[in-house]
Amino acid sequence: MPHNTRVFVVFLVLTAILSACSAQGSDSSTNVRVTLTDFGVVSSSTQFTAGIPYTFTITNEGQVPHEFMFIPPVMAGMADMHGEATHNTALIEVNESQLPPGATYVLSYTFPKSVAGTDLEIACHTPGHYEAGMRIPITVR
């Protein structure tokens, strides 16, 4: 193979490699693992920054279906609030049909700047689950 052809082939290969690396690096979301159990929530992170994209991998390791919500904490005396009122206050919701026992759900979410500094929770509001402790406070800066 002539020298010019080899140089051109090497150039093409290097260009392809650099393009592939650049494409992989363009996804700047932060990965967060969330595990739902009967009846608890564990998250690999509870500190978030508004405007930053996150990819949440949510796994239901429990024996019953669960919900996943970013929601303001329930006020005293309102722990049994369910249904439409709860769902209307959630920033995002993954419902029970999407999180049966053993399921994993991947969610991409960016907290809006409007929620920076507010109290939020990751919670399950399936009847009785929130009251059983299925919530964890999170901070959004």
Regions found by a protein language model. Name each.
Residues 1-9:
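Bacterial N-terminal signal peptides that target proteins for export
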Residues 17-20:
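C-terminal motif of bacterial Sec signal peptides marking the signal peptidase cleavage site
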Residues 22-24:
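Bacterial signal peptide processing site
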Residues 27-54:
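N-terminal edge beta-strand
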Residues 58-60:
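Asparagine-centered strand-capping/turn motif at beta-strand->loop junctions
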Residues 67-71:
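Beta-strand signatures of extracellular beta-sandwich domains
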